[in-house]
Amino acid sequence: RRYCLNSEALEFYEEGDDLPEGARPDAEIGYFAGGCFWGVEHGFSLLPGVLDVVSGYQQGTVDRPEYKAVCAGTTGHAESVKVVFDPDVIEFGTLCKYFMYLHDPTQLNRQGPDRGTQYRSGIYTVGEKQLNIARQVLSEVQASEEFSGRQIVTELEAAKTFWAAEDYHQDYIAKTGRVCHVNIPAALKAIGRDPADLSAGH
């Protein structure tokens, strides 16, 4: 038995896979790359309406890439996250705007101290609808006062195969308590959320 979480993306979970708890047949998927995936994964996991977040590798040229090869820059992959979300609770456009403030989209091939093409900024879209939404959000953010004089370098591409990262990368911040590069307060403010509004489960 298979569960389709996004018919447009043809994303399926086989029976026996870890289906996100509470996932509905019409849940959707978004893909985002914004530096080290540990922090990006954690940032998205806090949002109500986000059902599951997986760290992985995307937009590369090698099947089943491994962390060391990705870090060496030989596979062409970006560290990205797959976000499974309930569109009735949180819209794709809101996720895009949150993401643009979660990391620094003006840094080319790096985030904070992490440097390399694997740390590039990107939104990888599924279908024309997501592409148009992401394009509009990027345009609005670029025109905002916060980014005056700063050029956004986030790449906007059709999503290629997403490869889940090794198990030890999943939920890394939650498991270790380490601090990462993301700016969660700024991202929440950008979408009109207060940290106090986040449920205890997030």
Residue ranges and their predicted role:
Residues R1-H202:
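Flexible coil/turn and secondary-structure edge motifs
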